[in-house]
Amino acid sequence: MSPAGNADDVVNRVKEVRLAQGKTQEELGLTVGLTRQSIIAIEKGRFTPSIQTALRLAQALGTSVDRLFWLSGGGEDGAKT
């Protein structure tokens, strides 16, 4: 993991999208092949998933990877602010 505050930190809205769809962490984890603990770590930003896992999360949540994850140095969806 990169140091706190690094401009290249990956941030996400996995929890926001998951809750909007009424899914539990366990349900999402089962769908994408992860444990509930792994989903918690991703949602809290303690773990950045692989490209394959990010794609599976996006598919399971019916959205795109760039709507779920972006670099903190840019704005939402990676756009510079």
Model regions and ranges:
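Short, charged recognition helix plus adjacent turn
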Residues: 2, 69-81
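DNA major-groove recognition helix of helix-turn-helix/homeodomain DNA-binding modules
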Residues: 52-67
